[in-house]
Amino acid sequence: MRNKKVELLAPAGNAEAFYGAVHAGADAIYLGGNRFGARAYAENFSEDELVDCIRYAHLLGRKVYLTVNTLVKESEFSELYEYLMPYYRAGLDGVIIQDMGVFAFIRDAFPQMELHGSTQMTITGEYGAEFLKKQGACRVVPARELSLEEIRRIKEVTGMEIECFIHGAMCYCYSGQCLFSSILGGRSGNRGRCAQPCRLPYTVGGNRRECYPLSLKDMCTIENIPELIDAGIDSFKIEGRMKKPEYAAGVTAVYRKY
């Protein structure tokens, strides 16, 4: 198992980060356009930039996945079709999806498109993954809170491609289930507008001194790569579409060495 080829999947919040990650050795890049992505406050990509990135990646034998990982309103589906069509024609390699309505819509409207179940779908076991497979998904991003044994079980039962976060920020809540930003700041994380209140300092139990009780340490699995491969993971995903281009290139280069 350890000799199998594993995809190194890097984030890109803008064109500079994209080219940096590609030349640092990423096998694939995931990014968002100017609509329907979970990082609405990233710089993101214009239509022309994104099409250019797809073509450039393909020249080098790399892949590009587009995030469509927010909840979409009924009134927005016609806009979603027009939004995706240029990328579909350019040969976009796959879309990462949260909303099952969006999933069904893209499956029917763009039949050649690869469909990936986002970590925002809260896939925590084999039954959720098997359901997605029956709906037409070829890849799933399990919830970040799963153990390696739970991930291994999903792989063994479903045979699907497994994409897992291996580096970057962690969520204190269940993947895809956090409403903290909506409640505290009126900005919905499930619409790509998370204010990240979990990263803020708070006072606890009447103590005047502020602390960070909800801000988790970032994930780093550089010392666990053999175990990750043995668990059947097919794609190593680096978190960080809100990070600087230097971060995307630097972290990608480090993991590429392994």
Outline where the language-model segments fall.
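Conserved nucleotide-cofactor-binding alpha/beta core module
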Residues: E126-Y127
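Extended, alpha-helix-rich binding/interface surfaces that flank or overlap catalytic cores
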Residues: I238
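Active-site pocket-lining/capping segments in soluble small-molecule metabolic enzymes
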Residues: R2-I123, V141-E145, E150-S235, K244-Y258
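Hydrophobic alpha-helical bundles that form the membrane domains of multi-pass transporters
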Residues: Q135-G136, R241
